[in-house]
Amino acid sequence: MKKQIAVIGLEMHCEMKSNSKVFSPAKNAYSEIPNTNIAPLDMAFPGTLPVVNKECVKKALMMSIALNCKQPRYLVFDRKNYYYPDLPKGYQITQMNNPIGVDGKIDIEVNDKILPVYIHDIHLEEDSASLDHFF
């Protein structure tokens, strides 16, 4: 019988610490009154255009470098269309096809043994709203 090796993949989300949202000038603060930290762009009002937050790009690039990823020559963003209750626009701005970092690797020590952790990609994307459930 052929030896099999388990490969476990994890998707991790990190909230960017910044003054404003990734593509919107609206304040980036979670624990405030609902529907107060919004801008016309967050609701896809006609004529509104996103502007990427430079602070967020710098932080994502720093993470990409720290994890030994390859960085692209240009930043490209995609519009991912889907319906979800906390997605007021009906689409999400993301880097689904052209991430800010790809093919990374870090080594970790486990029981005196060095093991590689491979990073598929790091990408910026918006989460323009959230649902809070209090029971």
Region spans (language model):
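Basic, nucleic-acid-interacting segments
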Residues: 1-135
